[in-house]
């Protein structure tokens, strides 16, 4: 009966020590132990070693074939589909480029329009502020002229108002003017 050796085997020992009769303690097998084995056991060990090496080579060869075939299949598929896909990508890029240019132009036009509107509103605002200042100056001038005219006004004297009343009215108008400004 062939049993697997339960202990660890070093690299210096024969790699087939895993399949030997378990007659010795683990790790105690050396090359001399194999010299006394019968030819049948030697042949069986040789076959096990070759089988193990063959299995290892086949699995690594299978992995390399599997790994190498996949990209090869994909590259064949890619090369067949590449012109169509490249054309699709090129058209998509071209459409994207046109859309991006259109978007930039719209944005530029909108910015220019807003800039013009802003400048126009600033101009109108400046004109209105100038007009307000002009109207304030005109008001002050008219109040001054009115106050110069009041003491000599015949119409007011006929109404029964005295110069004192006129002076109080003038002070009241000045106060209202400063409150409104």
UniProtKB/Swiss-Prot annotation:
Compartments, record wording: Nucleus
One Pfam family this sequence matches: bZIP_1
Stated name of the protein: Cyclic AMP-dependent transcription factor ATF-3
One GO CC term on file: RNA polymerase II transcription regulator complex
Taxonomic source organism: Mus musculus
Lineage: Eukaryota, Metazoa, Chordata, Craniata, Vertebrata
GO molecular function, one term: DNA binding
Highest taxon in the source lineage: Eukaryota
Induction: By stress.
Protein family according to the UniProt entry: Belongs to the bZIP family. ATF subfamily.
